[in-house]
Regions:
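Phenylalanine-focused residue identity feature
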Residues: 19, 68, 79, 104-105
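Long, charge-dense
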Residues: 33-90
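Conserved mixed alpha/beta catalytic, RNA-binding, or beta-rich assembly cores of soluble enzyme
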Residues: 1-55
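Charge-patterned, long linear interaction tracts outside catalytic cores
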Residues: 95-107
Length: 107
């Protein structure tokens, strides 16, 4: 298991994509906690996983201030197919987040 902060909707997601490609056993990502005002990095990650990017590297559907990635489509597409993302952004309840983690460990 890896736990970390996604600090931005661009560089942070680029780093996460490269990490996931390097470690193909990474299958599940839980997006939780508060969004950073302006960046909306959690929402951007969910949009990337759902919609991908346009030809300019802009995350389709992202509503943050700078949702542009430098990763190539060759990296983005395997990331999108390799991982499942669970949206718990609105959940402030640690019991719900812990329950979701237990589901992953029992699989």
């Amino acid at each position: 298991m890896v736990v970390g902060r996604l600090l931005s909707e661009n560089r942070g997601i680029d780093i996460l994509i490269k990490f996931a490609i390097k470690y193909p056993d990474l299958r599940y990502i839980i997006v939780c906690a508060n969004e950073v005002k302006g960046d909306k990095s959690g929402q951007a990650l969910l949009s990337l996983h759902r919609n991908g990017t346009n030809k300019n590297g802009r995350i389709i559907g992202a509503i943050g201030t700078n949702p542009f990635l430098t990763c190539s489509q060759t990296d983005i597409e395997p990331f999108r197919t390799q991982t499942e993302i669970y949206n718990l952004i609105v959940s402030k309840d640690m019991q719900i987040i812990k329950a979701q983690l237990l589901i992953f460990f029992c699989q």
